[in-house]
Amino acid sequence: MAKVKFFKTNSAWGLEREVNEFIQNKNVINISYTVAECGYGYIHCCCVLYRE
């Protein structure tokens, strides 16, 4: 069964580190990434679809 993990941060570098640590030893199906401008900066979001 597939699972989804959602990440959100205000740092692209922090998001990349978190996602890279998470996907180790996972069977990744898809990774989607988006960035949105907010009044105070940017929000970086990533959604990982995977199987354990």
Language-model segments: which ranges?
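A short, charged, amphipathic alpha-helix used as a generic interaction element across diverse proteins
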Residues: 13-34
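Short linear sequence elements within intrinsically disordered, low-complexity coil regions
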Residues: 11-12, 27, 38, 47
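Short amphipathic
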Residues: 2-10
